[in-house]
Amino acid sequence: MEYKETVKKVIAEVCRLLLGVVFIFSGTVKAVDPMGGAIKIGDYLTSFGLDKLQPFTVLISFNLSALEFMLGVCMLLGVYRRYTTFLTLLMMSFMTPLTLYLAIFNPVSDCGCFGDALVISNWQTFYKNVVLLAAAIYVFIHNQRLLQGYTYHVYWFVALWSYVFAIGFAYRNYNHLPILDFRPYKLGANIPALMSIPEGAPEDEYAYSFIYERDGVQKEFSLENYPDSTCLLYTSPSPRDM
């Protein structure tokens, strides 16, 4: 019986450590570039037809990074164990099916969960969230087995400090260049070198098509089978990816 209890505590602590580290990292890299996070949130809103919320993207970006950072700190330190594990489970219960939808239908190129610091595919994001959801379920069920780093009387200070710190850090990076710039064209980068195409890399190919009309009949032509002058141009040429 004592052995089983020890195993449960160890598993709970491992899950707590995993969730805490991931949430702190995710919140930090979002706060590093809150404007980039706002742009990504705007992509989400456009994909789901919620353009009316576009004016609030920066506000959402600030608070999302602060919430993730606060939950990560509280998870690691055992602060408000019941509420922290519940909010973490609630967030993962929302994010996991959302990332499954992204993986299947691909409305945005990447989820942006780790900003520009670590770009992963939508399927990789979904698999990551499945693991985090399982860990969140376990720590929520066994939250009383988690060790506490502080007494109950200072819980509010730890939670408030972590949230305010993340907001202040994001605000600083919003008004100045990021302290840690993960973007490809950051200050000091060689832009011509970054824009060059590596040797042997596949290049884009384009095909031009023209729609001409003769005797009321419209036909599409390419540059290879261009018609004679008796046809009238119906639409101007437009390139398309091959």
List each language-model region with its residue ranges.
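Short, Lys/Arg-rich, polar N-terminal cytosolic tail immediately upstream
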Residues: 1-6
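Perimembrane loop-to-helix junctions flanking transmembrane segments
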Residues: 40-53
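Single conserved hydrophobic/aromatic residue that forms the stacking wall/gate
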Residues: 234-242
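Internal/C-terminal transmembrane anchor helices
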Residues: 149-177
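Functionalized membrane-embedded alpha-helices
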Residues: 9-32, 58-98
